């Protein structure tokens, strides 16, 4: 009798906290779960879903964007898969609340509660979608596949700040601080991830000006000694911003601090042509992570079956790879997305002449069937 699951395959039981969120969130997460179920069936795993509320839907149900119970249940899971949080800031009653009671405050609190410090944002240009890329054809034709790794908890955004009057002049001060431990842990994570990719790290800083960047560079060099298989380079942030549009194919893993990563990851996302294709992950110093699409809640198309679920499906692939060490399974999801695009299936945001238009559920069906 043929074995259903080949010898040597490790079968796992994993609990995934699922936060569908607001707007298009429930639709796109449902399709990602559909694909995960196909993975479980093919590879013999069991995925248990714990469905939680956060954001506007939690405000409506519980009066707050995030409850202590949701935090506890998220911590008890092996990973978190999330949709999108928030609504129309001009019309939604959620945005008449104080800032710390609005939907996005729940996400900030959850990230802090889960000790998430490393943000991963892949930027991939699929050859099938190269016409959507704003770069020159000769650049887009090469494609690119990079991972921006941004430190989330230190730097300018979390340093001491004040606004005061000095000698009659209003003066604002923000402090950029990093310690060696913060740098070391994000560098280790970057080199670990490079080992799963093309084994190259580009560390981005401003070491010609900033003391914090000089420390950053020193610690990265120390960490690199433990990864002889990984090539690495230092690049100044202004040069990196230029190289992203000049020759994005050169990058594999881009490691950088909080503010630089905030800016560079947005730049990298825009040259792909569609934010509906871009996954995201935030990790702590264990295997735990929160996985979500890079785009917003798109309330204008919510409930209309128009959303592109690919970013969320690719976020689920990242979950498999980085939290569960299921590289083969993650490869299968990414290959299934690739095949759907090669076969001409498109949601409205990436539609072009001659392609096959599908709904949100339609795209999920196609990708799940490709597993």
Task: Annotate the PLM regions.
Residues 2-11:
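Short, Lys/Arg-enriched N-terminal segments with co-localized hydrophobic residues
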Residues 56, 244-345:
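Glycine-rich phosphate/nucleotide-binding loop
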């Amino acid at each position: 009798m043929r074995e259903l699951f080949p010898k040597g395959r490790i079968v796992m039981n994993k609990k995934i906290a699922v936060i569908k969120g607001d707007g298009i969130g429930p639709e796109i997460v449902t399709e990602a779960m559909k694909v995960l179920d196909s993975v479980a069936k093919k590879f013999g795993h069991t995925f248990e879903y714990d469905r939680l509320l956060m954001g506007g839907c939690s405000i409506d149900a519980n009066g707050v964007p995030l409850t202590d119970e949701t935090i506890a249940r998220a911590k008890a899971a092996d990973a978190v898969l999330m949709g999108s949080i928030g609504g129309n800031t001009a019309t939604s009653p959620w945005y008449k609340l104080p800032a710390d009671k609005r939907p996005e405050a729940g996400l900030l609190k959850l990230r802090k509660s889960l000790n998430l410090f490393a943000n991963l944002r892949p930027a991939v240009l699929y050859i099938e979608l190269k016409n959507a890329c704003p770069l020159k054809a000769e650049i887009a034709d090469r494609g690119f596949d990079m991972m921006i790794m941004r430190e989330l908890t230190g730097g300018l955004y979390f340093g001491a700040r004040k606004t005061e009057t000095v000698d009659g002049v209003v003066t604002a001060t923000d402090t950029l601080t990093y310690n060696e431990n913060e740098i070391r842990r994000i560098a280790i994570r970057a080199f670990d991830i490079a080992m799963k990719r093309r084994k190259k790290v580009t560390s981005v800083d401003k070491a010609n000006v900033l003391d914090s960047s000089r420390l950053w560079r020193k610690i990265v060099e120390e960490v690199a000694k433990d990864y002889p298989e990984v090539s690495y380079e230092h690049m100044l942030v202004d040069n990196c911003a230029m190289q992203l549009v000049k020759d994005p194919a050169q990058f594999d893993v881009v490691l950088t601090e909080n503010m630089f990563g905030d800016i560079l990851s947005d730049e990298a996302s825009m040259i792909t042509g569609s934010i509906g294709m871009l996954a995201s992950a935030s990790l702590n110093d264990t295997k735990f992570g929160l996985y979500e699409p890079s785009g917003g809640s798109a309330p204008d198309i919510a409930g209309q079956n128009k959303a592109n679920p690919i970013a969320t499906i690719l976020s689920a692939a990242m979950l498999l790879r980085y939290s569960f060490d299921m590289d083969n399974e993650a490869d299968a999801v990414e290959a299934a997305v690739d095949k759907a695009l090669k076969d001409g299936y498109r949601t409205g945001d990436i539609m072009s002449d001659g392609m096959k238009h599908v709904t949100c559920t339609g795209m999920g069906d196609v990708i799940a069937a490709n597993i």
